[in-house]
Amino acid sequence: MKAEPARASFMRRQAVAFELGITRHTLARVLKNDPTFPRFFAITPGIEVIERLDFERWLQRKRLAARLNQHG
């Protein structure tokens, strides 16, 4: 049986904000102030997304950095 290629999973701003437990307004500030945050891109006029995998990698890096800072 032939394996299917992996399909990208995308997230809109509202879903990202929900995952982080913040408002979309706060997410806008994160985008403005954190150059490491994945950038949204338009898939159609008016619909911007980021790749879920990029978001999850960013979140893992943030969690790791927080743990390292916590332990000095």
Residue ranges and their predicted role:
Residues M1-R29, R61:
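Polyanion-binding surface elements
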Residues L20-V49, E56, A65:
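Major-groove DNA-recognition helix of helix-turn-helix-type DNA-binding domains
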Residues R52-G72:
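A short, Lys/Arg-enriched interface patch at domain edges and termini
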